[in-house]
């Protein structure tokens, strides 16, 4: 089964590219973040025309939003409001006996200080709640977390570890906390399973960088994690970097995983 995750940065603006990636990669499941669209105008018909019958989404005007676009039926589905804020950052679906969570973690603003930046406080609180939520789950469960987690946790997940230590998305407070979330849930990092350290791996390049490919000042903000029962069934992980160079791109690129779900 092919699973693709992508922060599309606006489903309406990026729909031609979503259609293109579907035609190129033919994913069975497509998980989108930052859809920026209200549920009442979600493009259901357009996805049905592309062969995706099963949809679950939560969205709001201009901000946030997550979606699952599927060729295969799912059982349970739902969401959680994190940190008691209804801002459409999470959904889950159950495929066979595996639960897949789609997250869009808050970016955190510009100043990495919870005392002066409410957006950074929201991010840290969100992650701590994720950690507590995962801690008591059984380690032998079948579970995947994917999406835009808005943190590059390892030194080789950014173009310059030294220069980004005080930049939101790579501060020690964030990176330590995200790794705590990973470990509290007994997850494996599927991208690093296939692209081991010290290989530099990025999934995001700023719009401010005109020659993004040459300068390659990227960060790995997008992730796919799986519990052990699932991680050993993964046959391929591919970061679709060329999508960053398409016309009117997202600043994130899609990530594709091929996996046998149980």
Identify what each model region corresponds to.
Residues 106-127, 162-167:
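Surface-exposed cleft-lining segments at the edges of enzyme active sites
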Residues 1-49, 63-66, 153, 262:
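N-terminal, active-site-proximal structural segment of metallo-dependent hydrolase catalytic domains
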Residues 238-262:
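Surface polyanion/phosphate-binding segment centered on an Asp-His-Pro turn
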Residues 1-9, 97-112, 116, 146, ...:
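Active-site-proximal beta-strand elements of phosphoester/diester hydrolases
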Residues 35-110:
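Structured beta-strand-rich core segments of catalytic domains in phosphoester-bond hydrolases
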Residues 71, 93-97, 227-228, 250, ...:
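Active-site beta-strand termini and strand-to-loop segments that position acidic
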Residues 62-76, 212-233:
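Conserved beta strand-loop-helix elements of the APE1-like EEP
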Residues 50-51, 126-223:
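Metal-dependent phosphoesterases centered on the DNase I-like endonuclease/exonuclease/phosphatase
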């Amino acid at each position: 089964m092919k699973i693709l995750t992508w922060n599309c940065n606006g489903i309406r603006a990026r729909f031609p590219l979503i259609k293109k990636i579907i035609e190129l990669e033919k994913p069975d499941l497509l998980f989108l973040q930052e859809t920026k669209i209200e549920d009442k105008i979600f493009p259901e018909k357009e996805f049905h025309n592309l062969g995706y019958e099963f949809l679950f989404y939560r969205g709001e005007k201009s901000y946030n939003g997550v979606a699952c676009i599927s060729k295969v039926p799912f059982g349970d589905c739902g969401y959680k409001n994190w940190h008691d804020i209804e801002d459409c950052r999470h959904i889950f679906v159950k495929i066979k006996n595996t639960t897949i969570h789609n997250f869009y973690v808050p970016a955190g603003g510009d100043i990495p200080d919870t005392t002066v930046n409410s957006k950074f406080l929201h991010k840290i609180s969100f992650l701590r709640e994720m950690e507590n939520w995962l801690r008591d789950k059984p380690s032998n469960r079948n579970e995947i977390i994917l999406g835009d987690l808005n943190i590059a946790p390892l030194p080789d997940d950014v173009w310059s570890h030294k220069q980004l230590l005080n930049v939101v998305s790579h501060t020690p407070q964030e990176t330590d906390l995200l790794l705590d979330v990973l470990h509290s849930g007994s997850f494996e990092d599927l991208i690093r399973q296939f692209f081991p350290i010290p290989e530099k791996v990025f999934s995001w390049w700023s719009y401010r960088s005109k020659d993004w490919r040459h300068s390659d000042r990227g960060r790995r903000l997008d992730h796919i994690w799986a519990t052990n029962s699932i991680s050993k069934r993964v046959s391929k992980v591919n970061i679709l970097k060329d999508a960053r160079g398409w016309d009117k791109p997202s600043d994130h690129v899609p990530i594709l995983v091929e996996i046998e779900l149980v």
